[in-house]
Amino acid sequence: MNEIINFSVQELIDKISNSQVTSVEICEAYIERINKFEKDINAWAFFDKELLLEKAKESDAYKKSGKPTGPLHGIPVAVKDIVGTLDMPTECGTPIRKGKSYSQNAEIVDLLTSSGAIVMGKTATTELAYLNPSKTKNPHDYSRTPGGSSSGSAAVIASYMAPLSIGSQTGGSIIRPASYCGVVGYKPSFGLISRNGALKTSEKLDHLGVFGKSVEDIAYLVKELIKKDSHDPATVYYSSSN
């Protein structure tokens, strides 16, 4: 096993900052893991290793230029396939949207990019985030469910195919798969993270949240996502330092 996939987010940040590891090396380590386990787990709705490596090379070149970098520079993050992305399909787990993309990035994707993170691919979801189960298997026992609807987002963390991931919850779609897959899931208080650009199922109940291997890992990501957004009137100002 490549030791890189065992590093905490803090360790990855520090090693990138100190030029001890590159974003390409990090992404290659996760690609190796995906190549080994994805055929059995089916956690990804969309994954293009060439696109990921291209983004990683751009990230490394930007750092090498000496320009200021964001707090998550070069860190790959998986995103649930109900969150709009311009450069990847957003199929929402339904054949109705096969191969279709959103017309703009979701706010959370723009925040990831602004922080320097790399969107590595789209994770599998139950159909329209609440109907038929996804294709994903529980990484600990392929005969069991990973839980839904954020099935892939939990499974990629449990199987070490990504260091961090974005999920969503309307009923129990973060906390349930986190529990089933044995990872940490964070469903924030309503209004902390913008839902603009993600599939809507309930204006008053929809949340976007985060999966990771530890509370500390999740904290690094959540800190960059808690922002007031004029396009999501539910969002409120809240200092991420709290």
List the predicted regions and their residue ranges.
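Short glycine/serine-rich loop/turn segments
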Residues: L72-L208
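Long amphipathic alpha-helix in the N-terminal Rossmann-like dinucleotide-binding domain
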Residues: E50-D60, T113-A117
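Short, conserved phosphate/pyrophosphate- and ester-handling motifs at nucleotide-, phospho-/glycolipid
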Residues: S19, K80, S214
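Residue-level signal for the nucleotide or nucleotide-sugar donor/cofactor binding architecture
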Residues: F7, F47, S151, D206, ...
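An N-terminal boundary/leader segment
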Residues: M1-E54
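Immediate post-signal peptide segment of exported/extracytoplasmic ligand-binding proteins
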Residues: S59-P76, D217, N242
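A short helix-breaking turn/cap at a secondary-structure junction
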Residues: K187-N242
